[in-house]
Amino acid sequence: MKNIKIEICAGSFEDAVLAEKAGASRIELNSSLFLGGLTPSLGTLKLVKKETHLEVMAMVRPRAAGFFYSSYEYKTMLEDAKLFIDNGADGLVFGFLKKDGTIDAKRCEALIKIAESRDKVFHRAIDVVPDPLKALDELISLGFTRVLTSGQEPTAYEGADLIAKMVKRAKGRIEILPGGGITEKNASKIIKLTGVDQIHFAALKRREEPSTKANPSIYYGGALYPPEDSIEVAGLDEMTKVIKSL
């Protein structure tokens, strides 16, 4: 199999260190992976750049759910993007949609300008646009480096047909990065089915967080009531298995 670029979705400084140990050369740096990945702290970015050799794509996403942002959220994203670029991020990951689900080119252009020569990655907002191939053409025209997609399906394996069409449509003008539900069992299949030369995945495990055990009736999250006595972290063995499966 051809040389495959490995990008791991990291939710912390520790995740990034483990991703490098597993064999990744690039990460998408986030916080709150449970929510699909939100903007990381500046401190996290600075530590990752200081103590690893990873290419770091910094997520710019201030909240969960969709991608039609208020003016307050948009201003926050602009400031976060500037801080990330000024502090060594190798690229920005973001996406803006209008109310109708089409790409908001004007807002995208603002962050593209901030990123300058660094990578500009349009995230999985592409997976909810009404016409993904038309949207891909627009991303190419805007100057995006790469687009992350599951092929408008819950997993990249299920969306392999559309991902393959996107690779063909791109013709090398933009990189197509499959992500979503990639595991050691399907990673190589996705590569073969789509013709991509890179993959994006998270490989997590739960780790005990003992400090809350005195009162297990307390929850700090929302209605989903996530467990407070454990946290999701990157699993070195889990990441390594995916990479070795290629």
Curated annotation (Swiss-Prot):
It is found in: Cytoplasm. Pfam families: CutC. GO terms for molecular function: copper ion binding. The keyword Ribosomal protein does not apply. Disulfide bonds: none annotated. Its main location: cytoplasm. GO terms for cellular component: cytoplasm. InterPro entries: CutC-like (IPR005627), CutC-like_dom_sf (IPR036822). Gene3D superfamilies: Copper homeostasis (CutC) domain. Keywords: Cytoplasm. PANTHER family: COPPER HOMEOSTASIS PROTEIN CUTC, COPPER HOMEOSTASIS PROTEIN CUTC HOMOLOG. Belongs to the CutC family. This is PF03932 family protein CutC.
